């Protein structure tokens, strides 16, 4: 009986550890420094504080333990507030926060550069190990839509085949209830 209780407790503790997996977000400067030491792809979440869909990504897709585990193993994950007033140095260039003539906060120059001037929130920038942008993906992505996209880039499948061919044979690691959220 004691063995059963111990086994049950260990199982519950391991499940809660898996459920607590979170994405290790960092600044773009930190990701750049780490990429030099240990090359890895970079995933940049470009968001704003007022964006409802950005908050939903944080609470659903990014909170999914399967997504978080994969992101932590294959990417340096960056959060970039598109309206920060901070000066950010990236790839040897300084980008300053933009303040409009009326004194209100504008869009940060790095966010504008990364999104090619197409400001939409949330948007995600996938960069290779050389810190070159491969893809900009705009809009909210539920777990079911996000998972194959991160595998397509994280497993470097994009080098070998089209996304259409990849999606045809992709096998999800998400549980059916985790993948049930429909794209909005």
Language model features with spans:
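Short, solvent-exposed mixed-charge patches
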Residues: 181-184
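Thioredoxin-like thiol-disulfide oxidoreductase module
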Residues: 28-33, 65-135, 143, 148-159
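Short active-site neighborhood of thiol/selenol oxidoreductases, capturing the structured segment around
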Residues: 38-52, 77
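Sec-dependent N-terminal signal peptides
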Residues: 4-19
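C-terminal partner/receptor-binding element of secreted or periplasmic proteins
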Residues: 157-177
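N-terminal "domain-start" segment that seeds a small globular fold
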Residues: 18-34
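Detector for the c-type heme attachment site
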Residues: 55-59
